């Protein structure tokens, strides 16, 4: 779960949340309190961390941390 750990670090840094609340099933907006600007900044930070490009149309589908992890795993295949 190395990708999850890296995603968690980015989420904690970007959203200023405690790492204990960042779980695979956590919803980025509802559970972690992100607003639309937070989501944009989070996506940009994830793109930089993993050296990937996440189109806006895909970013809208990333609701839970699990979605982010799976998306990045698929990009790295």
UniProtKB/Swiss-Prot annotation:
Domain of life of the native organism: Bacteria
Annotated protein name in UniProt: Acyl carrier protein
After translation, the protein is modified as follows: 4'-phosphopantetheine is transferred from CoA to a specific serine of apo-ACP by AcpS. This modification is essential for activity because fatty acids are bound in thioester linkage to the sulfhydryl of the prosthetic group.
Q: What Gene Ontology cellular component terms go with this record?
A: cytosol; membrane
Gene3D superfamilies assigned to the protein according to its UniProt record, in alphabetical order: ACP-like
**Which PROSITE patterns did the record assign?**
CARRIER, PHOSPHOPANTETHEINE
Q: Which GO terms describe its biological process?
A: lipid A biosynthetic process
Q: Where is the Carrier domain?
A: 1-76
Taxonomy of the source species: Bacteria, Pseudomonadati, Campylobacterota, Epsilonproteobacteria, Campylobacterales
Question: Predominant location of this chain?
Answer: cytoplasm
List of residues that carry O-(pantetheine 4'-phosphoryl)serine: 36
Q: Relate the protein's function as given in its record.
A: Carrier of the growing fatty acid chain in fatty acid biosynthesis.
Q: Name the pathway.
A: Lipid metabolism; fatty acid biosynthesis
GO-annotated molecular function: acyl binding; acyl carrier activity
The UniProt keywords, alphabetically, are: Cytoplasm, Fatty acid biosynthesis, Fatty acid metabolism, Lipid biosynthesis, Lipid metabolism, Phosphopantetheine, Phosphoprotein
Where's it found, cell-wise?
Answer: Cytoplasm
Tell me the Pfam families matching this sequence.
Answer: PP-binding (PF00550)
Query: Would you identify the family this protein belongs to, as annotated?
Result: Belongs to the acyl carrier protein (ACP) family.
